[in-house]
Amino acid sequence: MPDLSDLSRYIEISTNYVDREPAFEDGTPNPNFGKGAYVEVWNDTANKYVRVDNNGVVNGSAILIGTTSRPIRIHGPVTFTQDCVIKGVVEGQGTIYTGRNIHIVGSIKYKNPPDFRSNNPDQADKSNSSRDILALAARGSIIMGNTATFGYYPLNYMKPPFTKPRYDEFGNLVPAYNALEIDETGKPRYQSVYGDATISSISEPISQLDCVLYTNFLGGGQLGTGGGGVTFNGSIISKDEAMVIYSLPLVMNYDPRIRERKISNQPLIDVSLPRTPEIMISSWRDHGLFTRRNFHGAS
């Protein structure tokens, strides 16, 4: 797994990002062509959208809440130096990197979701190239649910022996994650810098997550507390997992738009996710068909 410990790398990516695609694969013009990274939320007092970032970077933490009529707007890779707290409706294509945690305090839903129901994969790719996609990548952990209500479940599974040490991409040993350990902010690692009172005041049950989640540490928390189960439309990539699911079903739908495709080795939508060098096929040899006998000797 690519390591997120060097946050300066992602700050540089965010600061220097410029959208170079004039149009989507479905032929529609790209309204963000030539623009840098940004994230916007609706401000009721100002009665307009306001940018949360400065040149693609949020110095500190921020709370992002979107609604159907006033979704969170994101474009490109945006880096938060501390926490990002998020819930609600999202519009656009982008990634949020955080220097600490990502706290998901309610369902996350796309305003313009993809639709993969097609007998023609290439046509489906083109149709979905302009649809919303969000990636959340935490240098710390991805914590889901109302931390004020965390007890034995899930906290017991957010510390050793359930979490394990790991080696980073440079061969350095990283100690096992311990949610109860106090970090440099003065908070336990599983809590937000905003504190439990603030998190509790804005938390809602999580029933749907339209996003790709990535963390070198832990992805966990409380999901499905409102009944009706949980649906992931994306993926979760984490070293440790401590999700407590309070209702069923648990449905996980992979979003193929983030994987490398065909000979281009590029994803359909590049939202600057952390990647390792992909495995390349250098040669292919067809040895023809052969049969293998089963355990009973029949061919």
Language model features: what each stretch is:
Residues 23, 32, 42, 54-62, ...:
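Short amphipathic alpha-helical surface micro-motifs
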Residues 24, 31-33, 53, 57, ...:
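Generic detector of intrinsically disordered, low-complexity, polar/charged segments
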Residues 1-23, 107-299:
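Predominantly polar beta-repeat domains that present long G/T/S/D/N-rich surfaces used to bind, process
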Residues 30, 37-39, 59, 79, ...:
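Polar low-complexity intrinsically disordered regions enriched in Ser/Thr and small residues
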Residues 1-69:
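Long, low-complexity, polar/charged, intrinsically disordered or flexibly structured peripheral segments
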Residues 49, 55, 61, 69-71, ...:
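Detector for repetitive beta-architecture
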